[in-house]
UniProtKB/Swiss-Prot annotation:
Protein name listed in UniProt: Metallothionein-1
Species, as recorded: Danio rerio
Sites where the protein binds a divalent metal cation 6: C36, C40, C43, C59
Stretches the record annotates as Alpha: 29-60
Residues at which a divalent metal cation 4 binds: C32, C33, C43, C47
Amino acid sequence: MDPCECAKTGACNCGATCKCTNCQCTTCKKSCCSCCPSGCSKCASGCVCKGNSCGTSCCQ
């Protein structure tokens, strides 16, 4: 069972607290998430989520 309902609801959970919205993925992939550490306005395209944040190298 796919825990990601992206195709149906456009939202999924990657990791414990990272929730991505406007998700177009058909399966739950961490790279689909756009969760960022506090202070980051956004993550670079294709950023891989690590828990509920991404590395500083992902931030733009």
